[in-house]
């Protein structure tokens, strides 16, 4: 960045997407400040790295800032945004600051409705194993490094590209991965056709020497391939994909398969993360690593060292034969994939606790949610996590629970108060169960409470 920018302020610095950029900037030597409504492990880590953290949002927090960075969750009526604009301090979206970091490196941007965080984490891990030493900015905690960001010494930056508000169009990556395209964020997009058009625009921003890595198994991605004007490769389980997986096996947490490139066998890949959807994420990673001329044996070694990502089928504990797992899945497609992973890896009763995320998403995808839980033996729903949204009349978790029952799901219970979910679980769980908390809100706390209570039990 131009030398006169010294102090950068983040509104909502504790968010997983904001904190990663802040950490990289701190490591680059910039003075970073930020505000959030509450303390967390994330804000404490940033303080330890030299960040100046304020609790609460007040105009005085931005007095010394040269630029103010906001996420899509921060609105124009935020007092820090108002103060910054009155002082003529530039206010920019998170994606613009990420684009600035990407401008300093060759960018590898992972886009798609689902699988971004896991795929970004896989790419970061495998490239590090190959000595490429990338800078990484991830929307989740990479277990192997204990954080969601790292400043590397290599030429590449690996980051998630967030399509939720179209801001990923600010990025100009060298390699663009599209894991899938699905109907989501319909409070911003008019429908699936606009979403597809936006992804086409994103892909075609790569330079002539760049590469698009596209999932051929996803129908919406396949639809846009004729519109792609840049060099691309494909991956998937279909025989037409350039990078393909065969002989897929799932056993507990271990997933393995044989990788092929254009009909030629590359070798076996094995990693500790369950689910067929993660085979696709791994294939995307292999495509990126191959483009960067990594040896296949280094790719194999990287997958063996992959330790997973926070809130992606993350085991919170196993007590008395009851395994408690948390997952960020909050879209019907993600939910079905996660439940299938649990059923495919273990022959155990599956108790699912789901907290819907946002009223708008629940409304737009209501019928898809109704049919997303058939792999759950027992389903518990709790009230919608609003994520700053106002309620929509008739859109409730209780109504969703009732509709799911009417569609043939036998064991469905609605527990309005999330704080009472743990007590309900204690009354029904038994040895051999997998308890899976699902959602992008705070439902993971119910699973953590359950682990504590089970450990305290005589």
Swiss-Prot record:
First-listed, main subcellular location of the protein, grouped into a coarse class: cytoplasm
Q: Which reaction(s) does its UniProt entry say it catalyses?
A: UDP-N-acetyl-alpha-D-muramate + L-alanine + ATP = UDP-N-acetyl-alpha-D-muramoyl-L-alanine + ADP + phosphate + H(+)
What pathway does the UniProt record associate with this protein?
A: Cell wall biogenesis; peptidoglycan biosynthesis
What positions does the entry give for ATP binding? 112-118
Keyword annotations: ATP-binding, Cell cycle, Cell division, Cell shape, Cell wall biogenesis/degradation, Cytoplasm, Ligase, Nucleotide-binding, Peptidoglycan synthesis
- GO terms for MF: ATP binding; UDP-N-acetylmuramate-L-alanine ligase activity
Does the record's keyword annotation contain Ligase? yes
State the compartments where it is located.
Cytoplasm
Question: GO CC terms for this protein?
Answer: cytoplasm
Please give the family membership noted in the entry. Answer: Belongs to the MurCDEF family.
In terms of NCBIfam families, this protein maps to:
murC
Q: What is this protein called?
A: UDP-N-acetylmuramate--L-alanine ligase
Organism, by scientific name, is Geotalea daltonii (strain DSM 22248 / JCM 15807 / FRC-32)
